[in-house]
Design a protein with these regions (language model features):
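Phosphate/nucleotide-binding beta-alpha loop and adjacent structural elements of enzyme active sites
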Residues: 1-314
């Protein structure tokens, strides 16, 4: 296996619910460092941890400081920023944002935390911290040069008071040589708007997927064969076979890959190309979209989020 002695290093910040299953589906050769400041969820993650995972009960920011963390009724929406009920009360189920308790946390930077656990390089970072993504990114600068991809929750309206919005986060990430490749959008409809089942509401937030392009990867200082291999697998984790193909060929053209590794990667990509062919029929996509719409119509509790994209990546 190409990753057997060259494991992926993944960081998951705001790790409620555990690591994305896409990584375990991709390979068993990875290490993931999970950060979860909410003591309720941290205990669950720690209990279910395995040898691939390092679970840390640390709050991250752009510096060392003390912050107030708002523990909400629904654990997943807890945030350092207070909920903005002037906005949230216009939409259904705002009660889940009700703050049950405030706790004070000492923050640290991702730079410092990764040094403490002996991680020198990272391949992928996912951040879902309810509006606090930008300060965390600003405290990660030592590692961003080596990172291939980012999945970041972004908001288009102020769900939390004082939070940075998409344009600020997007500007910072692009300044670090990442390109936006996909956006899973979440739409909400206003309360009490009657039968609007098949109509989208307002764009509220999303999950943004950023990659370094093949050209940007090849421009990384001290780029080597091992990093090329991991980069290709990062692309494949999200279904971007085309980016994998381009990176593979360009790396071969400048003699970054041995013939043995190149041949092995070609075989790997052929498997994914076959999978893509099986997914390419338009009828399958139409049926999938129809079933998604029917599920929302049947489950009226989810009606306010009609139009939300089903997934991120291919």
């Amino acid at each position: 296996m190409l990753l057997e002695n060259n494991q992926l290093i993944i960081v998951d910040i705001g790790a409620s619910g555990g690591i994305d299953t896409r990584w375990k589906n991709l390979t068993s050769y990875f290490k993931c460092i999970l950060f979860e400041p909410d003591p309720r969820e941290y205990s669950i993650l720690k209990e279910n941890s395995d040898s691939n995972l390092i679970v840390l009960n640390s709050a991250l920011s752009d510096s060392n400081k003390t912050v107030e963390f708002h523990l909400c009724q629904k654990q997943e929406v807890s945030s350092i920023f207070p909920p903005n009920f002037d906005l949230l009360n216009k939409f259904p189920d705002s009660e889940r944002f009700k703050v049950q308790k405030n706790i004070r946390l000492n923050t640290d930077t991702l730079n410092n935390q990764l040094i403490k656990v002996g991680v020198n390089e990272v391949d992928f970072i996912k951040i879902d911290t309810q509006g606090y993504e930008l300060p965390i990114l600003q405290g990660s600068y030592d590692y961003l040069d080596s990172v291939i991809g980012l999945e970041i929750e972004v908001e288009f309206v102020e769900m939390y008071k004082g939070q940075p919005l998409f344009d600020e986060v997007d500007g910072f990430v692009k300044s670090k040589n990442f390109s936006l490749v996909d956006l899973k959008r979440y739409f909400w409809k206003r309360k009490g708007t009657g039968n609007t089942t098949n109509k989208k509401g307002q764009l509220i937030f999303g999950d943004a997927l950023y990659f370094k392009t093949p050209e940007q990867i090849l421009a990384i200082s001290n780029i080597n064969q091992e990093k090329i291999i991991r980069s290709i697998y990062i692309y494949l984790a999200y279904g971007y076979v085309d980016l994998s193909q381009v990176l593979l060929q360009e790396a071969k053209n400048i003699n970054l890959l041995t013939e043995e590794v190149f041949t092995s990667l070609v075989k790997t990509l052929k498997k994914y190309e076959k999978n893509e062919l099986g997914k390419s029929f338009r009828l399958r996509k139409k049926i999938s979209n129809l079933l998604h719409k029917l599920s929302i119509i049947i489950n009226l509790d989810e009606d306010y989020s009609f139009g939300t994209d089903q997934k991120i990546g291919n």
